Amino acid sequence: MLYALDPNGETTTATMNGGYITNNKAKEGAGVYIYAGNPQFGDSKSKADFTFNGGSITNNVASESGGGIYVTWNGNVVMNNGIIKNNTAGIAGGGVATYDQFVGVVGGQKVPYSRVGAPWNNWPNIYRAGFTMNGGSIDGNKATSNGTNKLGDKGVGAGIYIASA
């Protein structure tokens, strides 16, 4: 498993040029988990980037999102080559899940982060979720319906799931 986190809420970046990530289990991001930490709202420096240039991410199982790859807080994935195959997510993004984090949990309640400091109309300009595929293959991934994510989705994005405002 590849795990990258910046606890200061700055840019978290990881690149995979080859090798194998296989047969892992986790709640989110069973193969690859990239998270920008705890950013301050409105801080455009806060982002999580993963570049996949080669290798394989296979047979990983996430009970919630991102069986193969999970990237969150202004999450961006660029796939130039490689294989994402036979990964499973219990809710969303069997192969890849990337989030902008517009919805969060505050005081045990699911609310848009706009209620706690980042206005909705600026959100897409500050935090974006994206996926670019220039090559490689995404095949045989699954998203089941074992629950719902914070957006109310379930069983979506078997190959790729992008949640952006």
Where on the chain are the PLM-derived regions?
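Surface-exposed loop/turn motifs in large extracellular/passenger domains
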Residues: M1-K25, Y33-V61, I69-T88, V96-A165
